[in-house]
Amino acid sequence: METKRVEIPGSVLDDLCSRFILHIPSEERDNAIRVCFQIELAHWFYLDFYMQNTPGLPQCGIRDFAKAVFSHCPFLLPQGEDVEKVLDEWKEYKMGVPTYGAIILDETLENVLLVQGYLAKSGWGFPKGKVNKEEAPHDCAAREVFEETGFDIKDYICKDDYIELRINDQLARLYIIPGIPKDTKFNPKTRREIRNIEWFSIEKLPCHRNDMTPKSKLGLAPNKFFMAIPFIRPLRDWLSRRFGDSSDSDNGFSSTGSTPAKPTVEKLSRTKFRHSQQLFPDGSPGDQWVKHRQPLQQKPYNNHSEMSDLLKGKNQSMRGNGRKQYQDSPNQKKRTNGLQPAKQQNSLMKCEKKLHPRKLQDNFETDAVYDLPSSSEDQLLEHAEGQPVACNGHCKFPFSSRAFLSFKFDHNAIMKILDL
């Protein structure tokens, strides 16, 4: 037995049509597409007010509601157009209407504000909406953000800072609003449109639909962020370009705006410059090593034996790798008077390494930062950003090799070993 479908009372339709449709200009009322936009406004009003205040009214989607309105006011379709065809054309037209909104970042630049639609299956996305006729893009963004969050971005918006994408032939532009405190109170101005408003860590949001980062860190499937996914990677790139270099400012913003070699969102939020944790901000690791190496080259080796040790160690490693083997001539052995103990010590060290093989974990724990003992006098090391850093006792170099840092060039020692 089929249950009879409850219809919207005629009195309710009369009120809604008088509020949203009958008062519009005649040239717009003759356009079925424009009428559909007004019907959409009436549908929202019906869900927000009538259904809450009048128990027993049927809950219906936009298509069923539009059919009821066109049936109640047949003069809205004077040519007798098919309602389904009109609704399909309206839906296609809506997909071509640009949408504008905002990406709101907190003061650390680590978190972003997302909104969730009212329906149970709605995902998380940025506050945005369709532009009205003859409305400026930044005005539309401010209006939509205020309607969905209750926060006015007019005083924060910059017309040149935005991410613009074309998704399914629909233009979407989101203005970037950094530096909003996390304790800001958000309160949607529209009813039954926004269910939740929350801050999310940018690092925990997915970059593509198969990115399982939110599943492991937030307990949410990546499809819950399908509306935000297209903007996450461009947002990270924008942050890296704009705030890539750390600064001493308290707000975490950079004054230089240069791009680091390997920027991370976590790095952008640091409020103070930490020299021991900087990851090559001005170029490649090779460039960083050259800058640290230059002041160390000024002091030569104390004797020739140290340089000979280094070269012999290199020859031994080349023999182990199967490369060209070099034989020590008798003359060379005679010149290396004090090298036998050092050679034996190297052999003992190699045996110890074989007995205690190096673990991969040790590479990360011990090679990340090496302590290089210096003389009693303070050495000034050239930092990556050109600022001298006083070094007394021990200095820490990020991701540098001990062999590189301890290398000292002695021309005379090399010439004697090569017998030139």
UniProtKB/Swiss-Prot annotation:
GO terms for cellular component: cell junction; cytoplasm; cytoplasmic ribonucleoprotein granule; cytosol; nucleoplasm; P-body; RISC complex. Expressed in brain and testis. Not detected in heart (at protein level). GO terms for molecular function: 5'-(N(7)-methylguanosine 5'-triphospho)-[mRNA] hydrolase activity; 5'-3' RNA exonuclease activity; manganese ion binding; RNA exonuclease activity, producing 5'-phosphomonoesters; telomerase RNA binding. Mn(2+) ion is required for highest activity. Can also utilize magnesium ions. Keywords: Cytoplasm, Hydrolase, Manganese, Metal-binding, Nonsense-mediated mRNA decay, Nucleus, Phosphoprotein, RNA-binding. It is found in: Cytoplasm, P-body; Nucleus. GO terms for biological process: deadenylation-dependent decapping of nuclear-transcribed mRNA; histone mRNA catabolic process; mRNA catabolic process; negative regulation of telomere maintenance via telomerase; nuclear-transcribed mRNA catabolic process, deadenylation-dependent decay; nuclear-transcribed mRNA catabolic process, nonsense-mediated decay; regulation of mRNA stability; regulation of telomerase RNA localization to Cajal body. Changing E148Q: Strongly reduced decapping activity. Mn(2+) binds at E144, E148. It is an enzyme of class 3 (hydrolase). Pfam families: DCP2 (PF05026), NUDIX (PF00293). Its cofactor is Mn(2+); Mg(2+). InterPro entries: DCP2_BoxA, DCP2_BoxA_sf, Dcp2_NUDIX, NUDIX_hydrolase-like_dom_sf, NUDIX_hydrolase_CS, NUDIX_hydrolase_dom. Residues 95-226 form the Nudix hydrolase domain. It catalyses: a 5'-end (N(7)-methyl 5'-triphosphoguanosine)-ribonucleoside in mRNA + H2O = N(7)-methyl-GDP + a 5'-end phospho-ribonucleoside in mRNA + 2 H(+). Belongs to the Nudix hydrolase family. DCP2 subfamily. Found in a mRNA decay complex with LSM1, LSM3, LSM4, EXOSC2, EXOSC4, EXOSC10, PARN, XRN1, CNOT6, UPF1, UPF2 and UPF3B. Forms a complex with DCP1A, EDC3, DDX6 and EDC4/HEDLS, within this complex directly interacts with EDC4/HEDLS. Interacts with DPC1B. Interacts (via N-terminus and C-terminus) with TRIM21 (via N-terminus and C-terminus). Associates with polysomes. Interacts with LIMD1, WTIP and AJUBA. Interacts with DDX17 in an RNA-dependent manner. Interacts with ZC3HAV1. Interacts with APOBEC3G in an RNA-dependent manner. Interacts with ZFP36L1 (via N-terminus). Interacts with NBDY. This is m7GpppN-mRNA hydrolase. It comes from Homo sapiens (Human).
